[in-house]
Each structure stands twice: as structure tokens, then as C-alpha cells.
Amino acid sequence: KEKQKKLWPLMAAAASQDNDIRKYEEIGTHPAANHNAISAALAFHRGIGVERKVARLRFLRDRWAKRLLAESPRVKVLTPLDSPYSGAIGLVNVEGLEFDKLGGWLMSKHRIVNTPILHKEFNGLRITPNVYTTTDEIDTFADKMMYAIKNGIS
């Protein structure tokens, strides 16, 4: 508290706020879309229902994951596919592939959104479909992964 007076806020603050923690609050313009979309998003979520949403997300994840596992012994899915606590997210590892390069290739060449996970204990690509992801999009992802596994990326 005694250091507050000397520490400048990032945004302009009145001198009367020198000793007030609120001088660090940002009170600028905030995007209205976030606030305005909440009720529509909740209505959509409730319309689908939690059980159907989770079932759809698991179906999409399992569609690509089980295909890759069946088609290549180099594939490991690090997300437990049989866990009641998992849904859409799948972390896939392929022996011999560099995931930062693979992730960049998938995004730049094929516009497939992914997140390379580079960790001391494990590496892979995090793949996260959403309820509106089509089976054709999932199959395209699996096709491109199989291409990379068999031929490498260029």
C-alpha cells in the first residue's frame, strides 16, 4: 500500500487516486459483442443439451483418433479415449514427426487449426473440434495426418 503512490498506472488517473488501488483499473471501451452474445450462446447450449453436446464432441474426436491409431503403429493418442472426463480435445503424438512444423504445415497449407504441444514429458498436436465441425472436416484432417505420416511434410 505504501508503494502505490509512486507506482504509475498504465492508464491516466486523477491525483486524488494516488493512494487508491482503483487507479490501476482500466475503464475503457469494451467490445459489446461478448456481452450481447451470451444469451444466444446459452440458448444454443441449452437447446443442444449437455449430453448430446458431449456425445457429438467425443464422436468427432474418436473419428479421427481411432482412424489414425488403426492406420499407423507410429500414432499414439495421449488423451484417454475411454475416460468419462474427456470430450473434444485430443492430443496426438506421431513418432518421428516434429509437431511445431506439422502444426504450421496443417495451418498454412490446409487451414486446419491445431495447437502444437511441446513439453519435456510429451509432445503432440492438440486437436479440438467443436459441435459445428463436420465429419468431412474431420476426415480431411485425418487424411492430411496420414499423408504427413507416410510422406512427411513439405
Question: What do these predicted regions represent?
Answer:
Residues 1-47:
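Conserved core segment of the aminotransferase class I/II
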Residues 21, 85-89, 122-126:
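Short, solvent-exposed beta-strand edge segments and adjacent coil->beta transition regions
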Residues 31-37, 41, 87-97, 144:
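Conserved N-terminal glycine/acidic-rich loop preference
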Residues 33, 38-78:
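Conserved PLP-dependent catalytic core of the aminotransferase class-I/II
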Residues 35-38, 65, 99, 103, ...:
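A general structural signal for well-ordered alpha-helical segments in protein cores
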Residues 58-62, 69-109:
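Conserved PLP-binding catalytic core of the aspartate aminotransferase-like
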Residues 108-154:
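PLP-dependent enzyme catalytic core of the Aspartate aminotransferase-like
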